[in-house]
């Protein structure tokens, strides 16, 4: 039977049909090879936008720097980064006038945070540029390496464990004439294998000491490493993103804390909230503009797009903003907040791996590292690459490019949002002093502008004024990519508004299905995604029920765990059938053990083990959840776990799901190939780090574990704790006298060894 597709929409309001326009099926594109070209593009573009600024030279590193601040006012519509300090400060002053006490209060909140934050805050985050090894590392390892180097160079303030004291060490490290670091290197040698009698290459990892003079150290401390951004949809070209080192991270964190505190108090800010809270905040602004425009005014909304937001921002300008916001605060606080923008004004961009050349005729491949680009003959490169290299050469020092203007992606999202909101704030009638006025929403570089005026000419004048005001602050609204509509229909941060925010369910499609973590987590995540979409994305009961059935089917095919009474033959069916036959209460078997599915849309919030617990055979319960069963993983399992969900568009979301530790919550083993590479030394460091932390937690169970305050080391804390516990256990008769004496002896030995060290 043929169905006329328009019939499907008869009962559906037009705006709900947005889910049918979904273009993003299939996998997103990933980048391969080197990111050097993209990074050079970023550096060259950023300098081009500020080309009429003033050139200076950094006295410490010798890096050439371009300063566009207070540069010539733009005469055309090309993007430019010539922010005017006085305009920026005035916008900030008006923002404060409209929100009395906002900066003052945020400073007080931030000061409290600054004094309480522990240095382990910096272990959050994925890849971090590790300046000691000159490449990316997991954040925790990079921090450990930095602290280790600091201590071996006599910088000890970090021992208190407070982030602010670690930052004191960072400041001091920059004054040192030289810094000694430990780096890893690789030795290769050919040896004969005893068993196969063949020659094999054996790699050994060594650690060696290396001295960096002040200039080399400063360059590393100011370096942002670059990578290619992966999985970006809807773009033909890839682009580079930056990851800063540990010296910069702490300072950025405090600046963003202050800016976040300000954003929370601004009704036009789309950060730091998300989800339904964000939608409510935005709907308020729209409602305000629409109620005020009913009779005499017309109202239009621009779905805005800015050209190269962060390449036109400037750290020097952020310094002015911070100086203004903190103007009545204590000196130490102002200093600590001004360091991040100062470091960014002197930043260096690491160019990545360099280029790979291969000769088809001679079957040769060779790597041209970024360090070699400064003086290699350009005849080997194609035209476009040659132009890039010629342009970037004057900026190169040791394989990094001096990049003073521009902010790099994602570094100061909150602070740049404050800047954007300060322009939206200027749209009030008391500032425009005319018949048009505006308001809007800002979330990092994304904005929506709502303009009200008596007639179309007024709307046009309002938009023009907004556009020019933006230019004065180094923000470039793209006339090509922004579009205007009657208020009531616009898009902001992938939320589509049409008389209210429309649920764009298709965005969530990629997160339906089996995640591939393990049987336990996948079941839990799968039903949680369906539950969340019923709550947040207008997923109706019938569709949810269908989604659930499809998910169970998908899950059974993935893990080959079809019901015990099915005819489908898989590798597991022999075991599953055997279990099915010897189980009395078949309803109690988990789906992953060939049991039936008991989920429906009413009980999605219950973990499967809990749902079926009462129905399980006793011996099955005992095998499934017995802590003594070697297959029950208790290593990583908390009662709540986090999964990272990737929607089709927009940022990855963190999603909590219930985790019940069973034989199905296995954790896959680390790939063995890492053990033969230069990463091996790092892996050993990481395991050592992990062991120490686990040991420490044995001594201090979570209930009694307070973060150590004062300067006692972990070892001292554990020894004194062991002594106290041993005495209590001995006096209450839980341990014998000889055990007690033994423990005391071990404690004394440990202390003795520490003294000798």
Swiss-Prot record:
Protein name per the record: RNA-directed RNA polymerase catalytic subunit
E.C. numbers: 2.7.7.48
Gene designation per UniProt: PB1
Compartment(s) where it occurs, according to its Swiss-Prot or TrEMBL record: Host nucleus; Host cytoplasm
Assembly notes: Influenza RNA polymerase is composed of three subunits: PB1, PB2 and PA. Interacts (via N-terminus) with PA (via C-terminus). Interacts (via C-terminus) with PB2 (via N-terminus); this interaction is essential for transcription initiation. Interacts (via C-terminus) with human PKP2 (via N-terminus); the interaction competitively inhibits the interaction between the RNA polymerase subunits PB1 and PB2.
Coiled-coil residue spans: none
Role this protein plays: RNA-dependent RNA polymerase which is responsible for replication and transcription of virus RNA segments. The transcription of viral mRNAs occurs by a unique mechanism called cap-snatching. 5' methylated caps of cellular mRNAs are cleaved after 10-13 nucleotides by PA. In turn, these short capped RNAs are used as primers by PB1 for transcription of viral mRNAs. During virus replication, PB1 initiates RNA synthesis and copy vRNA into complementary RNA (cRNA) which in turn serves as a template for the production of more vRNAs.
Chain intervals for the UniProt region annotation (Disordered): 50-82
Domain RdRp catalytic: 286-483
Span list, region Promoter-binding site: 249-256
């Amino acid at each position: 039977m043929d169905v006329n597709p328009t019939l499907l929409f008869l009962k559906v309001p037009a705006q709900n049909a947005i889910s049918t326009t979904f273009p993003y099926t299939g996998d997103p594109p990933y980048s391969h090879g080197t990111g050097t070209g993209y990074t050079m593009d970023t550096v060259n573009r950023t300098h081009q936008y500020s080309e009429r600024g003033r050139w200076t030279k950094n006295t410490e590193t010798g890096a050439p720097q371009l300063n566009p601040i207070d540069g010539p006012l733009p005469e055309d519509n090309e993007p430019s980064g010539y922010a005017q300090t006085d305009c920026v400060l005035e916008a900030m002053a008006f923002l404060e006038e409209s929100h009395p006490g906002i900066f003052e209060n945020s400073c007080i909140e931030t000061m409290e945070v600054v004094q309480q934050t522990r240095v382990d805050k910096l272990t959050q985050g994925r890849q971090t540029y590790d300046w000691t090894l000159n490449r990316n590392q997991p954040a925790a390892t990079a921090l450990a390496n930095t602290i280790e180097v600091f201590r071996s160079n006599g910088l000890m303030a970090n021992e208190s464990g407070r982030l602010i004291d670690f930052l004191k060490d960072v400041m001091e490290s920059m004054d040192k004439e030289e810094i000694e670091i430990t780096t890893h290197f690789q030795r290769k040698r050919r040896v004969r294998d005893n068993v196969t009698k063949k020659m094999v290459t054996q790699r050994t990892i060594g650690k060696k000491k290396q001295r960096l003079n002040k200039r080399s150290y400063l360059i590393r401390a100011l370096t942002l490493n670059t990578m290619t951004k992966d999985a970006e949809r809807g773009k033909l070209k890839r682009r580079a993103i930056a990851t800063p080192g540990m010296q910069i991270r702490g300072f950025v964190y405090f600046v963003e804390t202050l800016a976040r505190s300000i954003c929370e108090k601004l009704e036009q800010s789309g950060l730091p909230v998300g989800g339904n809270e964000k939608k409510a905040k935005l709907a308020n602004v729209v409602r305000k503009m629409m109620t005020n425009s009913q009779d005499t005014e017309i109202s239009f909304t621009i779905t805005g797009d800015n050209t190269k937001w962060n390449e036109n921002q400037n750290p020097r300008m952020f310094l002015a903003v911070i100086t203004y916001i903190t103007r009545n605060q204590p000196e130490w606080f102002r200093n600590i907040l001004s360091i991040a923008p100062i470091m960014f004004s002197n930043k260096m961009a690491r160019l990545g791996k360099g280029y790979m050349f291969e000769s088809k005729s001679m079957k040769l491949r060779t790597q041209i590292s970024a360090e070699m680009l400064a003086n290699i003959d350009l005849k080997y490169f194609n035209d476009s690459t040659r132009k890039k290299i010629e342009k970037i050469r004057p900026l190169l020092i040791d394989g990094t490019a001096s990049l003073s203007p521009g902010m790099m992606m994602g570094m100061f999202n909150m602070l740049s949002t404050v800047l954007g909101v300060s322009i939206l704030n200027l749209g009030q009638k008391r500032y425009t002093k005319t018949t048009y006025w505006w308001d809007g929403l800002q979330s990092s570089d994304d904005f929506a502008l709502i303009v009200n005026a008596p007639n179309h000419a007024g709307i046009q004048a309002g938009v023009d004024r907004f556009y020019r005001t933006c230019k004065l602050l180094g923000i470039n609204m793209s006339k090509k990519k922004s579009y205007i509509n009657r208020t009531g229909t616009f898009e902001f941060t992938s939320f589509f508004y049409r008389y209210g925010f429309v649920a764009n369910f298709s965005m969530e499609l990629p997160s339906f299905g089996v995640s591939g973590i393990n049987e336990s987590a996948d079941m839990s995540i799968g039903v949680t995604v369906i539950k969340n979409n019923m709550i947040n994305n207008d997923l109706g009961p019938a569709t949810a029920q269908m989604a659930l059935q499809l998910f169970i089917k998908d899950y059974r095919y993935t893990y080959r765990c079809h019901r015990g009474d099915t005819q489908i033959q898989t590798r597991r069916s022999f075991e599953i059938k055997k279990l099915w036959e010897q189980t009395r209460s078949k309803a109690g078997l988990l789906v992953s053990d060939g049991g039936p599915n008991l989920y429906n849309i009413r009980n999605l919030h219950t973990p499967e083990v809990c749902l079926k617990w009462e129905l399980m055979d006793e011996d099955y319960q005992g095998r499934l959840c017995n802590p003594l069963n070697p297959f029950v993983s208790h290593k990583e399992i908390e009662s709540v776990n986090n999964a990272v969900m990737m929607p089709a568009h927009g940022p990855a979301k963190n999603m909590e799901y219930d985790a019940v530790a069973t034989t199905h919550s296995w954790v896959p083993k680390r790939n063995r190939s890492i053990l033969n590479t230069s990463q091996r030394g790092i892996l050993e460091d990481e395991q050592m780090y992990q062991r120490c932390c686990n040991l420490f937690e044995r001594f201090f169970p979570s209930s009694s574990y307070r973060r150590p305050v004062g300067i006692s080391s972990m070892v001292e804390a554990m020894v004194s704790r062991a002594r106290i516990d041993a005495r209590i256990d001995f006096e209450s008769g839980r341990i014998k006298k000889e055990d007690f004496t033994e423990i005391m002896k071990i404690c004394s030995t440990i202390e003795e060894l520490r003294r000798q060290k």
